[in-house]
């Protein structure tokens, strides 16, 4: 088992409904520590850079609009196998396929408005964390 850090976003659909505390509780119950967190309102341009890997996908513009439509909570989670653990706690991208008790099964409104984002690999976690946080903000 390896101590890892991963990146998470609580998306606009969840912040609009005041679900930040409930979602954070799910992370903590799973053994993940929140070592950095801030509430921000991304611009469409910031969302575009962050999701640049999807620029050629048909949902890209809609995703950038959504992610800049209201505040989000960006955070760094730390724990044993944090990337896999976070993905397990989040559940499948499509809430209809998400296991009971996962964040998306409980809180997501649709595939597009699925409440949370999480890194999928150590390399992407490092890039995503660095996009929003400086080293001094990571308090573990």
Curated annotation (Swiss-Prot):
Location of this chain's protein in the cell: Cytoplasm
GO terms for biological process, alphabetical: CTP biosynthetic process; GTP biosynthetic process; UTP biosynthetic process
Catalytic activity: a 2'-deoxyribonucleoside 5'-diphosphate + ATP = a 2'-deoxyribonucleoside 5'-triphosphate + ADP; a ribonucleoside 5'-diphosphate + ATP = a ribonucleoside 5'-triphosphate + ADP
Record keywords: ATP-binding, Cytoplasm, Kinase, Magnesium, Metal-binding, Nucleotide metabolism, Nucleotide-binding, Phosphoprotein, Transferase
Cofactor(s) required, per the database record: Mg(2+)
Binding positions (ATP): 11, 59, 87, 93, 104, 114
GO CC terms: cytoplasm
EC number of this enzyme: 2.7.4.6
GO terms assigned for molecular function: ATP binding; metal ion binding; nucleoside diphosphate kinase activity
Database matches in SUPFAM superfamilies: Nucleoside diphosphate kinase, NDK
Residues at the active site: 117
InterPro entries, sorted: NDK-like_dom, NDK-like_dom_sf, Nucleoside_diP_kinase, Nucleoside_diP_kinase_AS
Quaternary structure, from the entry: Homotetramer.
Functional note: Major role in the synthesis of nucleoside triphosphates other than ATP. The ATP gamma phosphate is transferred to the NDP beta phosphate via a ping-pong mechanism, using a phosphorylated active-site intermediate.
Family named by the database record: Belongs to the NDK family.
Identification of the protein by name: Nucleoside diphosphate kinase
Organism: Ruegeria pomeroyi (strain ATCC 700808 / DSM 15171 / DSS-3)
């Amino acid at each position: 088992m390896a101590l890892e850090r991963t990146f998470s976003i609580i998306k606009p659909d969840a912040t609009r409904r005041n679900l930040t505390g409930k979602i954070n509780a799910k992370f903590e119950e799973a053994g993940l520590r929140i070592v950095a967190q801030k509430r921000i309102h991304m611009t469409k341009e910031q969302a575009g850079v962050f999701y640049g890997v999807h620029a050629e996908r048909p949902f890209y513009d809609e995703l950038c609009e959504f992610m800049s439509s209201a505040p989000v909570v960006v955070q760094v989670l730390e724990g044993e196998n944090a990337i896999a653990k976070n993905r397990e706690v989040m559940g499948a991208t499509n809430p209809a396929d998400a296991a009971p008790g996962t964040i998306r099964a409980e809180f997501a409104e649709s595939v597009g408005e699925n409440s949370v984002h999480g890194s999928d690999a150590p390399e992407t976690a490092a890039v995503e964390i660095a996009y929003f946080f400086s080293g001094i903000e990571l308090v573990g």
